[in-house]
């Protein structure tokens, strides 16, 4: 083979790896382990796009490098196959999700294999396989059968809580539980019937039913998480989302808030990700106090949580969340209609949107007043959408002088602003600094903020109207989805009380349905399943688990994927331990990464695993960006208006498949055939055409802006794609995809090939390498290894290119040097490396060969280029041998022609020579 035939080479070695099970992984106690994992993909579209391989290639480079350093490497891959993305794709294509998911998984595996990724495919898992989700259901049952002991800071079996209730009732039990729990004695507990006991236990279980306000999308027919809603629309599909009360399964993740915070300290994660989790958990220390309100002839108490009890005398109003139970109750008759309208509008916005929209102030006065606990002055009570029902008590005391959101609210509605902390000017903005002394504050006057905080809490406690409290922003995780394509929740109902399906009857398999589409009323598709009951005739839960259920523990299953007795065996878990390096997108910071930590800590508490944290080190690969196209739907219609005419209408931007667009012009017929709901679409055109909007953003299936890597592999080969993807820039940075530079990377691989082959055939010799060749190759060994260790893959590729250029210039065809070159190239371009390794005469795979060691002797420079400065300003650079005495350097510098012109006729006061650093002439 005289030319670089990448197609033949890549097919040959991919088949070789498969036939010889080169990447099959076993437990080797004599070797150190290394567990490297990619976040597994959703197989929800037509396959991978060029943005996906960025993290996969990076992890593969590290996996191959670690094998070459003597580690036993676990590097698996699987598929996050349940959930909304896969189901929506099935609905769009009119096929059953089981069919589309299986087809997409096959396509993904084919694409991953053709990239030369060194996965152990024997360990492949899919979250939609009954053998897998049997254990997802089993873990849910463990959550249902557990409670959290605050005194011990760990989960315990529910049977132990029952024993405590039998012995002492619940009055002394320190447990994470519902806010309102009825107290009972041991005797009262013992007198209860079974149904009453189960109802009480539900308030303590870590998996429990609750009435909660959710993001409901009628079009998608399901509840959405906050992160799945943007500007009141579903992130997937752009459908309207409303807020409504529903009975949902939830997981009591709030029990783990302090441990989730503490665990972050020891993780080698990006600081930004740790900060996102801290903010999402939102631990705040402050005080909770009660305000009395008399409205409509009745007295009520409004508890308020504040992190600034020192500013109590700056309160000028109270604000309730639109969802607050008193919002309607205390409203006066004249305000009621307007308040009802406002509450409806506000509650239909997601909490994320309400928090983010700092420039848009809205609110409604209830007509009622509360009494200030110290001044006894009346405080107007408002409803405001910047107050969230789930944080604190759902009510805030407005202190405009010292809180920016309160300040904006007070300015907008012309409410009083009373400054109580000295040091700032509140004429234009709130003074939020936590320094200064108190004034306008009665018994707190003259105190520092710290001392005033302490005194205010003591006063509240002495009056019996408040206490110190720690609160959290994190809510319990809603676990129900009113969809079909998910794990059935293994619960049945007896007299409306939930009970777990017996473990020996798992998996509770998802039944095959003729119609699996969601319903706008909220009735889950499983309601149409015939005989969806236990063998005793009890109805089974109709909701399914959310998309994140299967991904919350999958990293354990890779360790022991065929174990039928346990989700992971102790031998496998003891050897592989935690994931050493995890790669995936930063968008999962407050979702998957938090839930996986929660499930791991829970399983640790019950003794099923021996680690508390699943991922020791984390890398977020930057986005590979693509050019997106947009159409503009006129709200409430199926009509779309062209880009330059959109401002005349109230529209919603919607992503459209870039393959339906050419030069920003939409193919109308193909667009109407794209999805069933678009077949009746009409258009407002400009000059007879529909012009699309465009934007460079994340390449994503949901944005329909993906580019297929198959075309790149077909034209240039997988090794070129691997190298080019790494060469684009630092792994963590976002990078726009374009094909302009890929030709140069392909030429680099051709140049590597030509070190081994010319047209006449192989040209390898056994000659002793020259000093120059040794220097080039050992410098590359050192730099490439250092780059891999710090995940600087782009500079590693650059150093490989520099080395090959130097070897080409030196006309190197020496076996020893080229052997080392192939070894350091192998993690990046494994197919070509395998072929060249074979040409060098080796019988085994290069994947089993050790990484070369550089020798310091070849890195020592014989000369050094000295910068020559005159009065501190560099005027020239001259090379001298590194061992030349300083006197000789001084002599040659002063006589060098490039220096003579600067010192001619000048008196030289001193010459300072610093060996292998610089020379400075003082004149």
Curated annotation (Swiss-Prot):
It is an enzyme of class 6 (ligase). The keyword Ligase applies. ATP binds at residue 701. It comes from the Bacteria. Its EC number is 6.1.1.4. It catalyses: tRNA(Leu) + L-leucine + ATP = L-leucyl-tRNA(Leu) + AMP + diphosphate. A motif ('KMSKS' region) lies at residues 698-702. It is found in: Cytoplasm. GO terms for biological process: leucyl-tRNA aminoacylation. InterPro entries: aa-tRNA-synth_I_CS, aa-tRNA-synth_Ia, Leu-tRNA-ligase, Leu_tRNA-synth_edit, M/V/L/I-tRNA-synth_anticd-bd, Rossmann-like_a/b/a_fold, tRNAsynth_Ia_anticodon-bd, Val/Leu/Ile-tRNA-synth_edit. Keywords: Aminoacyl-tRNA synthetase, ATP-binding, Cytoplasm, Ligase, Nucleotide-binding, Protein biosynthesis. A motif ('HIGH' region) lies at residues 41-52. NCBIfam families: leuS_bact. This is Leucine--tRNA ligase. It comes from Amoebophilus asiaticus (strain 5a2).
């Amino acid at each position: 083979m005289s030319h670089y035939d990448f197609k033949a080479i890549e097919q040959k070695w991919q088949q070789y790896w498969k036939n010889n099970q080169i990447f099959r992984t076993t437990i080797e106690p004599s070797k150190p382990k290394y567990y490297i994992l990619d976040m597994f993909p959703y197989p929800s579209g037509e396959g991978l796009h060029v943005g996906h391989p960025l993290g996969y290639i990076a992890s593969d480079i590290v996996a191959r490098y670690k094998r070459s350093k003597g580690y036993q490497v676990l590097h698996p891959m699987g598929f996050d196959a349940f959930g909304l993305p896969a189901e929506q794709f099935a609905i769009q294509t009119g096929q059953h999700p089981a069919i589309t998911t299986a087809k997409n998984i096959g396509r993904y595996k084919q694409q991953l294999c053709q990239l030369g990724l060194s996965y152990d495919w024997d360990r492949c898992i899919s979250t939609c396989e009954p053998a897998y989700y049997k254990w997802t259901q089993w873990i849910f049952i463990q959550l249902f059968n557990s409670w959290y002991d605050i005194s011990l800071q760990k989960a315990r079996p529910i049977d132990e809580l029952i024993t405590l209730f039998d012995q002492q009732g619940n009055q002394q039990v320190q447990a994470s539980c519902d806010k309102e729990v009825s107290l009972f004695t041991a005797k009262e507990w013992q007198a209860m019937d079974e149904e009453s006991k189960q109802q009480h236990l539900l308030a303590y279980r870590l998996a429990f039913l609750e009435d909660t306000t959710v993001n409901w999308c009628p079009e998608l027919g399901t509840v959405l998480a906050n992160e799945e809603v943007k500007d009141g629309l579903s992130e997937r599909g752009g459908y309207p989302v409303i807020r409504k009360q529903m009975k949902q399964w939830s997981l009591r993740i709030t029990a783990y808030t302090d441990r989730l915070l503490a665990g972050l300290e020891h993780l080698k994660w990006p600081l930004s990700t740790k900060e996102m989790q801290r903010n999402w958990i939102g631990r705040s220390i402050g005080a909770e106090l009660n305000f009395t309100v008399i409205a409509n002839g009745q007295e009520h108490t409004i508890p308020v949580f504040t992190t600034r009890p020192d500013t109590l005398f700056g309160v000028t109003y109270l604000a309730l969340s639109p969802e607050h139970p008193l919002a309607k109750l205390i409203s006066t008759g004249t305000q009621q209609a307007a308040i009802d309208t406002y509450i409806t509008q506000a509650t239909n916005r997601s909490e994320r949107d309400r928090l983010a929209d700092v420039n848009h102030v809205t609110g409604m006065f209830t007509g009622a007043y509360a009494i200030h606990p110290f001044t006894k002055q009346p405080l107007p009570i408002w409803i405001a959408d910047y107050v969230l029902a789930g944080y604190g008590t759902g009510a805030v005391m407005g202190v405009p002088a010292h809180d920016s959101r309160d300040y904006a609210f007070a300015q907008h509605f012309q409410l009083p602003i009373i400054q109580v902390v000295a040091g700032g000017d509140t004429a234009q903005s709130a003074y939020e600094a936590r320094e200064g002394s108190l004034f306008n504050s009665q018994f707190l006057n003259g105190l520092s903020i710290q001392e005033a905080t302490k005194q205010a809490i003591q006063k509240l406690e002495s009056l019996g109207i408040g206490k110190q409290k720690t609160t959290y922003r994190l809510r319990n995780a809603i676990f129900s989805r009113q969809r079909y394509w998910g794990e059935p929740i293994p619960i049945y109902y007896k007299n409306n009380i939930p009970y777990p399906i017996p473990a020996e009857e798992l998996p509770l398999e998802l039944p095959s349905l003729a119609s699996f589409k969601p319903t706008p009323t909220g009735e889950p598709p499983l309601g149409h399943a015939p005989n969806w009951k236990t063998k005793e005739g009890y109805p089974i839960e109709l909701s399914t688990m959310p998309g994140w259920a299967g991904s919350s523990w999958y990293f354990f299953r890779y360790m022991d994927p065929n174990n039928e007795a346990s989700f992971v065996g102790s031998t496998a878990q003891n050897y592989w331990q935690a994931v050493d390096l995890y790669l995936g997108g930063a968008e999962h910071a407050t979702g998957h990464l938090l839930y996986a930590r929660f499930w791991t800590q829970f399983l640790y508490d019950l003794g099923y695993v021996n680690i508390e944290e699943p991922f020791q080190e984390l890398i977020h690969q930057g986005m590979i960006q693509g050019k997106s196209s947009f159409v503009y739907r006129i709200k409430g219609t199926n009509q779309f208006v062209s880009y330059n005419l959109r401002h005349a209408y109230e529209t919603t931007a919607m992503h459209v498949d870039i393959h339906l667009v050419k030069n920003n012009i939409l193919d109308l017929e193909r667009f109407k055939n794209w999805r069933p709901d678009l077949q009746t679409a009409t258009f407002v055109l400009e000059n007879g055409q529909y012009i699309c909007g465009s934007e460079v953003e994340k390449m994503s299936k949901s944005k329909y802006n993906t580019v297929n890597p198959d075309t790149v592999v077909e034209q240039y080969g997988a090794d070129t794609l691997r190298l080019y993807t790494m060469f684009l820039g630092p792994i963590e940075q976002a990078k726009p995809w374009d094909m302009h530079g890929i030709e140069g990377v392909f030429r680099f691989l051709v140049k590597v090939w030509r070190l081994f082959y010319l047209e006449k055939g192989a040209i390898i010799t056994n000659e002793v390498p020259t000093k120059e060749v040794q220097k080039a190759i050992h410098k590359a060994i050192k730099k490439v290894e250092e780059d891999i260790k710090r995940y600087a893959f782009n500079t590693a590729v650059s150093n490989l290119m520099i080395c090959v250029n130097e070897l080409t210039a030196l006309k190197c065809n020496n076996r020893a040097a080229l052997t080392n070159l192939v070894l350091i190239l192998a993690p990046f371009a494994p197919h070509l490396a395998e072929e060249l390794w074979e040409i060098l005469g080796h019988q085994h795979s290069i994947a089993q060969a050790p990484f070369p060691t550089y020798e310091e002797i070849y890195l020592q420079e014989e000369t050094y280029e000295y910068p020559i400065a005159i009065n501190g300003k560099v005027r020239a650079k001259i090379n001298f041998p590194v061992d030349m005495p300083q006197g000789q350097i001084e002599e040659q510098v002063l006589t060098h022609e490039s220096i003579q012109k600067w010192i001619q006729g000048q008196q030289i006061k001193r010459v300072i020579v610093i060996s292998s650093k610089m020379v400075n002439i003082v004149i």
